Regions:
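A short acidic (Asp/Glu
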Residues: 27-31, 53-55, 93-96, 121-126, ...
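Hydrophobic/aromatic-rich, well-ordered segments within soluble, folded domains that form packed cores
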Residues: 62-82, 112-113, 377-401
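C-terminal catalytic domain of photolyase/cryptochrome flavoproteins
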Residues: 8, 20, 252, 271, ...
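Beta-rich, aromatic/charged-enriched effector core domains that present basic-aromatic interfaces
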Residues: 94-243, 424
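Substrate/cofactor-recognition hotspot
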Residues: 14-30, 57, 185-312, 482-514
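Short His-Asn-centered micro-motif
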Residues: 18-21, 44-45, 84-86, 113-116, ...
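Gly/Ser/Thr-rich loops at beta-strand to alpha-helix junctions
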Residues: 23-25, 90, 115-123, 394
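N-terminal beta-strand-loop-alpha-helix module at the start
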Residues: 2-86
Length: 514
């Protein structure tokens, strides 16, 4: 039900509680200590959030469906919810514009919100509130295990920021995967070395467990219809939409992952197999990033599965590290470095994003598969993002801001606080090593080792020149040549740069011309 259908005589509004599309937890700090008789929840669907980047239709549908289910759940609890639907008459189609309309109509004494997950949105709402002359209280997001202040304290005085030290600190603080003496289970903090398996020539097992799917209910079906109508030119297959959009369904998805895929997740988390988008991955990032799932319950479920013998330690630790370590770490980086972080471009990359990133039409089998499932489903797992789509853009020298905007647009789990550092820093090395200690670059042989993509591809990963040369391999050697002076200063790149000496002047020229 829209805001227009809710209008009528009501009690004076004390506080307008702003709820954004990635803040769908009932225990959000904005709702704490609220008076349901005098406070009002405000939510708005606006085209701006799907058009500031060319958002995929599955991504837009996920946000709107989850928002509407949150609205209905709060109303069932007795909250008054002022909800602006995408097709409401008079919708200004911007968050700032809809906030102005709500304040002018409801006249709240003040505004309260949980800190936004996007700097652009935070600035827009802050500016709108200031222009209206209404106080805005911004509260810490309690969903996370590390506050922005705690991350600032962690980073203070350090010459370098590295995930591993941060991760160990949080393991100790929250007593996760520790023994009675406070030491890491298994005698080591990190089992990454055990988690790099591929499927070999045989591929994944025939009984590979499919993730639990969630058929759209009436609310979600209406959203799918609306998104198809309003965003016909945007990418994405709405017929395949099956994401959890409520906390109940998100918990079922978590239970399904823990029972059926986490036991093999660690070993195969970096593996790729054409036509198999899910493999042993959790599909939980979107639910967590919209706050349908609390990371504490996800971590607790994985740890419990290890302690009672259902999951080995490398799988449990590898999965927990992605959440407790990487997810919290990138958020800290984002808020510490914004707003200038999006413009970082350490390598001076200025190429345009290839058009096939929006069509999936390329002869490179690995890219065709990763892009195809991304554009269709709004999903690719982390190695496809880092070492296929991200690697190609890095080697080609695509402008990092363009790569960032593509990642933010196409993936259903993309919220800027988590997507931008992963793209700008980890994938594109545009921050010069703030996020990652070296650029993650490789020839096509890496993809050959971790997938079956090369077997049916017309390009040869072991060739760098000639008509059959793999573009990844050619661009790898070109990348090393272009950035040789910079990379020489990085000890972790020493061996790769040294290998340039194996190329004759003629080979170097051929690589550049290819």
């Amino acid at each position: 039900m829209s805001a227009q259908k809710e209008r009528g005589p009501t009690a004076p509004v004390e506080r307008l509680l702003l709820v954004l599309g990635d803040q769908l937890n009932a225990d959000a700090s904005a709702l704490a200590e609220a008076d349901r008789a005098r406070d009002v929840l405000w939510m708005a669907e606006v085209q701006e959030e799907s058009r500031h980047v060319w958002s995929s239709r599955p991504r837009t549908a996920l946000f709107l469906a989850a928002m509407r289910h949150f609205r209905d759940a709060r109303r069932a609890e007795g909250w008054r919810v002022e909800y602006v639907a995408l097709d409401d008459p008079g919708n200004s189609q911007t968050l700032a514009g809809e906030l102005r309309r709500a304040v002018e109509r409801l006249r709240p004494r003040r505004l309260v919100m949980t800190a936004a997950g996007d700097h652009r949105v935070a600035q827009a709402l802050s500016s709108a509130a200031a222009g209206l002359g209404v106080p805005l209280e911004v509260r810490e997001d309690r969903h996370f295990l590390c506050s922005t202040a705690e991350f600032t304290a962690h980073a203070a005085g350090r010459k370098q920021l590295r995930l591993e030290f941060f991760y160990r600190e949080l393991r100790r603080r929250h007593r996760i995967l520790l023994d009675d003496a406070g030491e890491p289970l298994g005698g080591q903090w990190n089992f990454d070395h055990d988690n790099r398996g591929s499927f070999g020539r045989e591929g994944p097992p025939a009984d590979l467990p499919a993730p639990r799917h969630f058929a759209p209910d009436a609310v979600t079906r209406e959203v799918l219809r609306l998104v198809a109508e309003r965003f016909p030119e945007h990418p994405g297959d709405l017929a395949a939409f099956d994401w959890p959009v409520t906390p109940v369904d998100a918990r079922l998805a978590l239970d399904d992952f823990i029972a059926h895929r986490l036991p093999q997740f660690g070993r195969y988390q970096d593996a790729i197999w054409l036509g198999e988008p899910w493999l042993y991955h959790s599909r939980l990032a979107a639910a967590m990033n919209l706050k349908l799932l609390n990371p504490r319950e996800v971590i607790a479920a994985a740890e419990a599965a290890h302690r009672d013998g259902r999951v080995d330690l490398p799988s449990a630790e590898g999965f927990i590290r992605q959440i407790l370590g990487w997810r919290e770490y990138v958020r800290g980086i984002y808020w510490r470095e914004m707003p200038g972080y999006l413009e970082r471009n350490e390598l001076g990359a200025e190429e345009s994003l290839p058009k096939f990133y929006w069509t999936g039409e390329t002869e490179m089998a690995c890219l065709r598969d990763a892009l195809g499932q991304t554009l269709r489903l709004g999903y690719a797992h982390h190695i496809q993002r880092l070492m296929v789509t991200g690697l190609y853009a890095l080697l080609l020298g695509v402008r990092p801001r363009s790569v960032h905007e593509w990642y933010l647009a196409v993936y259903v789990d993309a919220v800027e606080w988590v997507e931008a550092p992963n793209t700008i820093g980890m994938s594109q090395y545009a921050d010069g090593g703030l996020m990652a200690s070296k650029p993650y670059v490789a020839t096509g042989k890496y993809i050959q080792r971790m997938s079956n993509a090369c077997a049916g591809c017309r390009f040869r990963p072991d060739e760098s020149t000639g008509v059959s040369a793999c573009p990844f391999t050619t661009l790898y050697w070109d990348f090393l040549q272009r950035h040789e002076p910079l990379l020489k200063r990085n000890q972790r790149m020493a061996l790769q740069v040294k290998n340039l000496a194996r190329l004759s002047p003629a080979q170097r020229t051929a690589v550049r011309q290819r």
